[in-house]
Amino acid sequence: MSHIDDLRAALADPPIEYRPEQRWWLAEGLHTDDTLRHEIDRAHRLGFGGMEFLAMPEESIDESRYGWGSEEWTHDSRTIVSETTARGMSFSFTSGTNWSNANLPTITPDDDAAAQELDVVYEDVSGSRDGALPRTELDAAYDGPDLVFERIPGKTQRFVAVVAAAVTRGVTGGEAADEGRAGGGDGPDGATPVIDVASLTDLTGLVTGEGEERALTWSAPDERAWRLFVFWQHGTGQIARPSASVNYTINYLERDGVDALTAYWRDVVLTDDLRANIAANPRAQMYMDSLELNLSGQAGMFWGRSVAEEFRARRGYDITPWLPLLVRRTPMMAVSTRYRYEGDAAHGVEVAKVRHDYVETLTDLYIDNMLLPFKEFLNDNGIALRAEISYGLPFELTRPGVAVDGIETESLEFGSQIDAYRLLAGPAHLLGRQYSSETGATTRNHMLDHRFYDQIIATQLAAGITKTVLHGWSSPRGAEGTTEWPGHEGMLPMFSERFDTRQPAAEFYPLWTRAVGRLQYVLRRGRPRIDVGILRTAHFTDNSSGMMFVDDEGRRTADEDKYGRDWMRARRNHWWRDLGMQDAGWTYEFFDPSYLLRPEAVLADGVLAPDGPGYQALIVYQEALGADAAARLVELAREGLRVLIVNGASELKRLETGEYTEHERAASRTPGLDGRDAELAAAMAELRALDAVAEIDDQAGTLDALRALGVTGYHEFAAPNENVLTYERRDGDLTHVYVYHFLYETGRETTVELRIPGIGAAHRLDHWGGRLHEAASRSDGGTSVVPVTLRPGEVAIITLDRSGAPAEAGAPDGAGSGDAGAAAPPS
């Protein structure tokens, strides 16, 4: 059977593993075996491919009997695993109760296995001071505007350090440029006080006493205003419900946390019967949602007993003297970080580098001490790890992709925005990971039509997201006295949606799930072909960019209006703001430069990672670039990889406040305080001298500059088109190009001529009917030209079958390199 015949056969009824899956909010452990079987059977009959299940708190319920960890919940979990496995469906555990983080009933805030933070107490010194050092108030209510979370404080704190600094005038947020934010500090009128960086003095060695009883005798060296920063470590006390006892959030930075987590799963959860069911299901998963780790202390810093030691080992200097300049407040997500103190202007770059080094170290520890050992444990037990890896916390966005089996994004925090989905596409494609999304959450439950959600899925497919997990499913049955029509909500009444049997649309779900399954089936075949990789390091990516729905006068704007008429649908992409490549039909995505140092980043046939995305060119635009990555760029460019240096580019910093980061000169310094700026400058000078490298000072010239370097899209439009997004898979003799008319509210019918290298028969997928129809095409040299007409919001997949073409008419090297068969891993 030929590839095209194999494709036709699979499209008639796509296998269950390609169907959309569901997040299932369970009313604690209240279900009976019969109701669980009923719900799973209904989901299966409607065509859903799997159930990601979690416990949600119910009012007036005895959590000691029904909460996470109880016998009732444990029994229900085993039943779900058994029943989904029996139907060929996947199942996904969560790493604790509800969705927010990994949490356990076996730890307390005073244990190293529980989440820890660094707290600070201030003392102003005029002249001399002598006596006990102030301690933090563990049970004090946090006075900031931060997101409210539940906590039960611990009883102990550990002395960490005391640092003195001369504090001078305040600055406004606009005066300080940094990777987080300035403003909202501890100075008068909310101004941010300025520290004389040269005055920072580590006094820890002068402290006497033991445990929590510490004292210091010290005299200020001059008459300036001096402040002592007294740092203490304690547990965050963050808890999660529902729990049969109390579940505390674990430590994500030190091995104590993951060791406690794996011990609990090994010794308590994974019984012999459960292990047998897991072994029978090839798609058993552990799912980790967006990282909702909260702090209550005044320093706002994630910490642990070994963080300072790890910082020194990894960054090469002592973090202690710099701690006052790391003190922060984070009103919501990491993007809202506000440093309470700024350094003087003369040391601005130095301070920014230290701040980068701190969050880079946090990322290292999250990867090494949480994700990698957890993944190893899960894989050893037949479970894959799927995770929303970084956003919301100051971890680098893409680097943790190396430590999971599946990389996930979501629609709630990123909206229906193609650039947001490109942010994590790079590591997914480079590593060959399944790229998925938690899709459908808004704050307008039961208010939006089905087309709205179809358009989110269509946008995500254009970035290579080929696994849709719907948000979500809830049984109509719920706790007596708290469940109202049209049924149990589970994920709070305001958050959409309920893709379950209560919906009138459920009548056509079998047709819909097959249609989505066909699209996902085709777009997982073979290898992705992405034209351009954009190097981007980000610890504070705005993951609230899909949630800010307020107009200039402070009035609420409906989600459907922002999704359908604003941002990308008003020609405003957030991170790569020039639209020239997109309008040409080219594809591009982002990843951290450290990926260039990985074994996947090999060059063959003029493309980077030919067994993955096959990038034909790389773009460098941010001011900060590591010296090792720059040296690797020189090697790659010498071997023929095209590199474009773009100066003067800007990217979104925070949508809510309208802030953008301006990159005056690309790769002009290293990110951290590593003393390698001169080494970077030398490497960039060498890079600029190479024939495969170009440099521009206007982002709008990107497409022309890449064409001048000899880049031709894997597929491209015969003429620019502002209505259509594309995504390509190379599948042996077949090339699949997904096309999507994304202006579903404001556009008109459009026809685009799609140029695909190679000569062959063109087909258009009818994803609703499961058929491939012959499509009109013509040849132009060695290229097939396929006209595609799309209505607003319509999607199509064009498949070019080159199996019957003469060898010389097949896809050429370069634009057609890197073919791979359908047996490739999903990415």
Where are these regions (language model features)?
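Carbohydrate-binding surfaces of carbohydrate-active enzymes
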Residues: 18-21, 32-37, 51, 61, ...
